[in-house]
Amino acid sequence: MCSSDLIAARARSLSAARAIIIVSAHWDTVAPTVGFADRPPTLHDFHGFPAALYDLRYPATGSRAAAEQVVDAIHAVGLAVERAPARGLDHGAWIPLRLMFPEAEVPVVPLSIQSHGGPRQAWQLGRALAPLAGQGFLVIGSGNVTHNLRDYRQAAHGGGPIPAYVRQFPSWLADRLLA
């Protein structure tokens, strides 16, 4: 079974979600920012791939009510939060969603990351989102712990083995997260 089949199977095993909060590593802002688009457009925020990839769309719907609940939850833990009225879904959001929910039947609320916010802010954001999971929200974090396409392509096209840092970093990270 390939990874896309595993993702689809896992999605089918989840209970029906009221809305999906998708946190993509490809939307990085200073403050947590919540997308409010009624029909978030599919963003093709990449280059150098086969033309067919640029034709793919994910016809998601948004939910202003769900987005407002996310804003309220973030405010409740003392974090400032921004609203993005027209934010679309970047490839870190729509690609996994397209595999998990191909019919786009569940409303989607995009949420940005803050790569310079530090661990305390990330922890607070997690505290804000946790109660929403108990209210029918599915919270999905998307992205790899390493993302160097140059090294990946070099290895994939016969240019050598996967670099050691790519093989070692996930274990290093897991050890620290579980400590």
Predicted regions and their residues:
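Short, small-residue-biased leader/transition segments that mark boundaries at the very start
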Residues: 1-3
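A short, N-terminal amphipathic alpha-helix
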Residues: 6-16
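N-terminal low-complexity or amphipathic/hydrophobic leaders
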Residues: 14-31
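Short beta-strand segments
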Residues: 21-25, 112-114, 140-142
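A charged helix-plus-loop insertion that forms the helical arch/lid used to bind
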Residues: 35-59
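Flexible, glycine/proline-enriched loop segments at strand-loop-helix junctions
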Residues: 53-61, 84, 112-119, 160
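Internal, conserved structured core segments that host functional sites
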Residues: 67-123, 128
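Surface-exposed, charge/polar-rich loops and edge strands
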Residues: 69, 76, 106-107, 115-117, ...
